[in-house]
């Protein structure tokens, strides 16, 4: 008998039905435009391949899902200062390098436009359209004085690290950006 015997199609179909879909989790820690773009490019790529993708926004990554502006509704002055010093909005993120007081970011956006590459807000919309889940870290929200009403629409869940870890333990790919 040949070692390359053909697999019965019914068995193969049953195995496919039992197989869990591939899963990806991405911790978005950075609030830098280039790093956030990388996170969303990976997320949309994985989702377009049929993978289940969960993004977990924490610390500076929360600025990505904040509404634009300098609003803070924290009660104590220290957390209010964090909120006010931290500009929110996916379109206002600085570059991780060569920021040059905003000039580098503007130059990067110009090059992206000329090459018809989507920016962070468009990548976020694409991710949502592809079913990527957005989780906002509640611990960090409280720590940084960011309230739920200052976040954009479409956050799927407000949760802590235990929720992320439950997602990550079943995922085949876990990234920290």
Feature annotation, model-predicted:
Residues 2-16:
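Positively charged, low-complexity intrinsically disordered leader regions
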Residues 26-36, 65, 111-115:
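Short, glycine-rich nucleotide/cofactor-binding loops
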Residues 37-50, 55:
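Histidine-anchored nucleotide/phosphate-binding helix
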Residues 47, 128, 169:
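Anion (oxyanion) recognition and catalysis
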Residues 53-59, 135-138:
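Short internal beta-strands
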Residues 65-75:
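Glycine-rich loop at the start of a catalytic domain that most often binds anionic cofactors/ligands
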Residues 73-112, 116:
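A glycine-rich helix N-cap at a beta->alpha junction
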Residues 101-162, 166:
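A charged, amphipathic interaction segment
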């Amino acid at each position: 008998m040949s070692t390359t015997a053909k697999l019965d199609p019914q068995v193969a179909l049953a195995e496919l039905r039992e197989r869990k879909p591939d899963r990806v989790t991405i911790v978005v820690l950075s609030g830098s435009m280039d790093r956030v773009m990388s996170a969303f490019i990976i997320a949309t790529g994985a989702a377009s391949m049929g993978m289940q993708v969960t993004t977990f926004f924490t610390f500076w990554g929360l600025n990505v899902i904040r509404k634009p502006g300098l609003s803070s509704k924290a009660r104590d002055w220290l957390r209010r200062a964090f909120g006010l010093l931290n500009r929110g909005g996916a379109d206002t993120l600085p570059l991780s390098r060569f920021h040059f007081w905003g000039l580098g970011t503007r130059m990067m956006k110009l090059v992206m436009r000329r090459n018809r590459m989507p920016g962070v807000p468009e990548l976020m919309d694409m991710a949502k359209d592809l079913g990527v889940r957005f989780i906002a870290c509640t611990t960090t929200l409280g720590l940084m004085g960011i309230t739920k009403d200052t976040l954009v629409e479409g956050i799927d869940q407000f949760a802590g690290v235990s929720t992320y870890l439950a997602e990550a333990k079943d995922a085949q790919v876990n990234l920290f950006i």
